[in-house]
């Protein structure tokens, strides 16, 4: 059904917050990598729950597709408008609504950026642990994909810090789930159902988040190894040592070299084949003791060195390279980002498989990621392949990679979500009964199937989405 522009204008009267047709910027109609494109008839910037509710009520009554969007940093095409309709951009709903220091919670709107929330609470002696690599991502987006990041090995992921949500269902109904209480054994946990649903079940309008005290001290350590296998195997020993690291990252030397050139800095021990980058936080004496324990274990298990990054400039440079690895690869060639997760004990097996696949196929695959939780980030590099060859070889190799991940007990995504790019692999590898249950929940909450249709687990609507 064609949009009734006058109806939308009655909901959002400010012409600067309602764009249509050719006035919609191109970046709103593609993914952040610029590879998947869609189209929409309207782009709305609501400022309140009431406006979101009114827009969804209109869309539900007239069966108009709606694509929720936060900061637009998603890497798997979750915010691409596949079926036209309305893009619902929540980026201007970005306020802190309440800081409750007694319950150690903060209530924010979904458009607030992660980096702004972290700065706000840390200035007040508090700490929001989830730490996805893209600091300019939105809190609503983080919750919608259950984003994790480097601190997940110690602190957990976004789901672990959501106490409550205000959401708007597809028909405009406003619903509160969760609350400031610590325990809740009352009925189904609707909050957990909505977290990670990628905008397919409801639109988040308020986020009640759990905070912890800001750590007193923090220390990062760079541990070089001759090869990646030795480094990954030593991680299991470190994790069993009760040293409680905040982050345990692994990087192959070949991707670090790209990051060094991109950032204009150098890592120590360029003779290494891989690096493990760790952080410890907590009380000063606890940090010192844990680092000393890990130093001994690492050197006993093949580490070439144990470099404490006590110099603030050096530490910042080392972490800047780690944070820029995807962009560093992208600067050299188009690439496909992957964030498969396997059991920690199978991380080395999966990387061994990927290295073999790279050698067999001739397609470069550089790996890094969160060794502490088995989340492997791959950059699959296009190189000089023409479009037809790139698409064919990419999908052939990704079919094999995802199949191996599932064989090892893993899943398609640790933190990016399924969106479009992982959808074909997810649908093939997920049990029919699970998909039927997910789609039944979708139909119950969104009977018209207007919210972010064709994404993630959905098997209705645009069934061809996700192949690009």
Predicted segments, located by residue:
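Noncatalytic alpha-helical scaffold of FAD-dependent oxidoreductases
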Residues: 1-468
């Amino acid at each position: 059904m064609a949009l009734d522009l006058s109806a939308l204008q009655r909901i959002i009267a400010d012409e600067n917050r309602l764009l249509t047709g050719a006035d919609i910027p191109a970046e709103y109609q593609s993914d952040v990598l610029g590879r998947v494109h869609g189209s929409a008839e309207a782009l709305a910037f609501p400022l309140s729950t009431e406006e979101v509710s009114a827009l969804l009520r209109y869309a539900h009554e007239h069966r108009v597709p709606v694509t929720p969007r936060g900061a637009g940093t998603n890497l798997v095409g979750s915010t691409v408008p596949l079926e036209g309709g309305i893009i619902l951009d929540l980026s201007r709903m970005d306020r802190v609504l309440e800081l409750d220091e007694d319950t150690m919670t903060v209530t924010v709107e979904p458009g607030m950026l992660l980096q702004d929330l972290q700065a706000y609470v840390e200035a007040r002696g508090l700490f929001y642990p989830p730490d996805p690599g893209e600091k300019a991502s939105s809190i609503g987006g983080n919750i919608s994909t259950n984003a994790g990041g480097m601190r997940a090995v110690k602190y957990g992921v976004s789901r672990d810090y959501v106490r409550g949500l205000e959401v708007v269902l597809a028909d405009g109904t406003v619903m509160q789930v969760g609350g400031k209480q610590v325990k809740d054994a009352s009925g189904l946990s609707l909050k957990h159902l909505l977290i990670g649903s990628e905008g397919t079940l409801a639109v988040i309008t308020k986020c009640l988040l759990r905070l912890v005290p800001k750590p007193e001290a923090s220390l990062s350590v760079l541990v070089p190894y001759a090869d990646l296998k030795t480094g990954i195997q030593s991680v299991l020993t470190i994790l069993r040592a009760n040293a409680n690291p905040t982050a345990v990252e692994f990087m192959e030397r070949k991707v670090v070299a790209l990051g060094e050139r991109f950032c204009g800095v150098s890592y120590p021990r360029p003779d290494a084949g891989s690096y493990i980058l760790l952080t410890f936080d907590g009380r000063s004496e606890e940090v010192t003791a844990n680092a000393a324990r890990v130093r001994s274990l690492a050197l006993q298990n093949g580490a070439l060195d144990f470099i404490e990054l006590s110099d603030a400039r050096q530490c910042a440079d080392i972490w800047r390279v780690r944070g820029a690895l995807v962009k560093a690869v992208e600067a050299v060639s188009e690439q496909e980002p992957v964030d498969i997760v396997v059991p920690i004990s199978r991380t080395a097996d999966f990387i061994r498989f990927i290295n073999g696949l790279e050698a067999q196929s001739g397609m470069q695959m550089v790996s890094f990621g969160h060794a502490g939780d088995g989340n492997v980030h791959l950059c699959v590099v296009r190189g000089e392949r023409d479009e037809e060859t790139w698409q064919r070889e990419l999908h052939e190799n990704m079919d094999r990679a995802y199949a191996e991940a599932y064989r090892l007990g893993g899943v398609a995504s640790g933190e990016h979500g399924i969106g479009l790019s992982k959808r074909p692999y997810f649908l093939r590898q997920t049990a029919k009964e699970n998909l039927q249950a997910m789609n039944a929940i979708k139909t119950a909450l969104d009977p018209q199937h207007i919210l972010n249709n064709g994404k993630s687990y959905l098997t209705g609507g645009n069934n061809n989405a996700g192949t690009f």
